Amino acid sequence: MTPLHGKTALVTGSTDGVGRLVAKRLAEAGFHVYVHGRDRKRGQEVVAEIRSKGGAADFQPADLSALAEVKGLARAVLDGTDRLDLLINNAGIGSGGTAGVRQTSRDGYELRFAVNYLSGFALTRLLLDQ
């Protein structure tokens, strides 16, 4: 058993890429991992992969461009565990897509600002306040 066995982590943006790899590595090290993303199918695939190798994981969906969903994610994680030992704010969106067209979140913020900055700050504060 490692010193990390039984610890709990939330990795945002962990249904693909770096976040997925980090979630899998944390589970291998003994963490119970909350996998996060927007796509339920991909989230469940990551959870199934972790569990198939003896790890512990759950999926929590949320669209981080909406502050209400950020709050819901924090609430779901806090309701599911006694403590959160590690938060990795990995989720983000790039600059691809509709060039020159202003995109805003449901809350009226610039989309990339909402996802890449506000959501991480808000999620951290919500989890720290508990």
Tell where the protein language model's regions lie, with residue ranges.
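Conserved glycine-rich Rossmann-like NAD(P)H-binding loop of the short-chain dehydrogenase/reductase
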Residues: A29-E45
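Conserved Rossmann-like nucleotide-binding pocket used by diverse enzymes
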Residues: L10, Y34, D58-Q60, F113
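A short, exposed helix-loop element centered on a Lys and neighboring polar residues
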Residues: T124-R125
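The beta1-alpha1 cofactor-binding region of Rossmann-like NAD(H)/NADP(H)-dependent oxidoreductases
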Residues: R40, Q60-R75
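Canonical Rossmann dinucleotide-binding motif of NAD(H)/NADP(H)-dependent dehydrogenases/reductases
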Residues: T2-Y34
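Catalytic Tyr-X3-Lys loop
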Residues: Q103-F121
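A glycine-rich helix->loop->beta "capping" turn
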Residues: S52-A56, A76-N89, S95-T104
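Alpha-helical segment proximal to the catalytic Tyr-Lys
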Residues: I93, D129
